[in-house]
From Swiss-Prot:
Statement: the UniProt record of this protein carries the keyword Amino-acid biosynthesis: no
Organism: Mus musculus
Membrane association type: Single-pass membrane protein
Protein's name according to its UniProt entry: GLIPR1-like protein 2
Chief site of localization: membrane
Length: 332
């Protein structure tokens, strides 16, 4: 017979095996994260330096269009547009956002939203690389004929220099695979109002010569302090975003306040009632004499039976007296 190992030795071996498996799982998870590009230091959509970089580059390229534009607007950042870009980027789909044409699904105010997308390896991504690649499409676009070279795409450039657009929001997302790239970066910018392909992107002429009322010329673009003011939509997020950020809007805050107030009111009422009626929840004690305590249950039952019998006899005597009185009245 083979000698069996002590149980303590077996238990330690199994415990070490379980620990080793856990370590291997953690290493595997770490490798997956590295492989998917999640460790890449891509900026968040509300990072100030990131915002200043892409907004500044948009305005720089818009202010140097050729031929010059008479009415191109100055661009400023919009948080709702950047949230929409982030939400669609999380899907890692290098295709047009299907929610852009649906009312208030891409912005709480604007109804016409434009979009530009760039995809490439994570290590190749920079804001300048992505946006200038859209600007390079101008080489395939003829402003005079309002046409694009056959088999070429000019839509990114047209949106980039669309005259009526003045709000922009961008986001970059790391994807395991997107647009034919592995370990990809998906960069999306949304614009409001969005551009179309129904006309030239702007009117040619002297810079800022046809700005609107109240506008001023800033870096060869039409700016307006009221129009360019930043609006922070605190409680708005794309309704189709998954997983959705946890947000408590004014109605949620009101309901929470109402519940807390109701709870406090109930506590106050209970305290007032208890202070005015201190014995309201106390049971009234039943006083039992020493003689009754000494009696057995059988004796108590017998006494109750005798009482009922006496009551029955009393009722019988009363009925006989009533019958005698009735007979005497009949005789009279």
């Amino acid at each position: 017979m083979k000698a069996s190992l002590p149980w303590s030795v077996v238990w330690r071996a199994q415990s070490n095996y379980v620990r080793l498996r856990r370590v291997l799982k953690l290493c595997e998870l770490w490798l997956l994260l590295v492989g998917s590009g999640l460790n890449a230091k891509l900026p968040l959509e509300e990072d100030v330096d990131f915002i200043n970089e892409y907004v500044g580059l948009h305005n720089e390229l818009r202010g140097t269009v050729f031929p010059p534009g008479v009415n191109l607007r100055f661009m400023t950042w919009d948080v709702a547009l950047s949230r929409t870009a982030r939400a669609w980027g999380k899907k890692c789909m290098y295709s047009r956002n299907t929610h852009l044409d649906k009312l208030h699904e891409s912005h709480p105010v604007f109804t016409e939203i434009g979009e530009n997308m760039w995809v490439g390896p994570v290590e190749d991504f920079t804001v300048t690389t992505a946006i200038r690649s859209w600007h390079e499409e101008r080489k395939s676009y003829s402003y005079l004929n309002d046409t694009c070279v056959e088999d070429q795409n000019c839509s990114h450039y047209i949106q980039l220099v669309w005259d009526s657009s003045y709000k922009v929001g961008c986001a970059v997302t790391s994807c395991a695979r997107a647009g034919g790239f592995t370990h990809a970066a998906l960069f999306i910018c949304n614009y409001a109002p969005g551009g179309t392909l129904t006309r030239r992107p702007y009117q040619a002429g002297q810079f800022c010569s046809r700005c609107g009322p109240g506008d001023q010329c800033t870096d060869y673009l039409c700016s307006n302090t009221v129009r360019d003011e930043a609006t922070y939509y605190q409680f708005w997020y794309p309704p189709w975003e998954k997983p959705r950020p946890v947000v408590c809007n004014p109605m949620c805050i009101f309901i929470l306040f109402l519940r807390v107030a109701s709870l406090l009111l109930c506590v106050i009422v209970v305290l007032i009632v208890q202070s005015r009626f201190p014995v309201i929840l106390m049971e009234t004690p039943t006083i039992i004499s020493a003689e009754e305590e000494g009696k057995t249950e059988v004796e108590i039952v017998m006494e109750e039976g005798e009482g009922e019998g006496e009551g029955g006899e009393g009722e019988g005597e009363g009925e006989e007296k009533e019958e005698e009185e009735m007979l005497e009245e009949d005789e009279q």
